[in-house]
Amino acid sequence: MQKALLVIDLQNDYFPGGNFELWNTSNVLQNTLKAIEKAKQQGVAIVLVQHIANPANGVSPFFNEGSKGVDIHPAILAAAPEAPIVIKRFADSFEATELEAKLTQLGTKEILVCGMMTQNCVTHTAISRAAEKYKTSILTDCCTTVSEIFHMIALGAVATRMTLQTSAEAF
């Protein structure tokens, strides 16, 4: 069964010095880097997802095209330099993107979802209608949001619909 690790929105604006710093980003970054390394060792495809705010909607609080904050964190790019990058403008990484085509091209049957923010882009991607054809898991230690409580609430909300596991359990 071909697996793919989806790394969603690990972008500079969510880290210290960014426009919308999240909770626990250092630990999540380290856990995600370990997951990427294990994925590479096990032949699991890696797909990076980058949110770019739609300029037609005016200036966004973060992820504005051309800003430093919109860039994927350099450690992620260094860890997965060959990974395709899917650009999105919505919380659901499948909506109006090439993600589904990329996963089909890779022969993907299972997706391991991680990233930022847990209650938004991570869960919206994991519960997307387009994700229904995949065995879907969220890597709980490779996700974060504005606070621990929001993170836990978001994971609890999708717990009956998919597997929640740590990256160590997944790999």
Regions found by a protein language model. Name each.
Residues 1-10:
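Short coil-to-beta-strand
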Residues 15, 19, 24, 33-37:
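Active-site neighborhood of HAD-like aspartate-dependent phosphohydrolases
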Residues 14-18, 55-59:
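A short acidic, helix-capping loop that chelates divalent metal ions and anchors anionic groups
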Residues 19-25, 60-65:
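Short glycine-enriched, charge-decorated loop/helix-capping segments at active-site entrances
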Residues 3-4, 31-42, 61-171:
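Active-site-adjacent betaalpha module
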Residues 39-56:
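PIN/NYN-family metal-dependent endoribonuclease catalytic core
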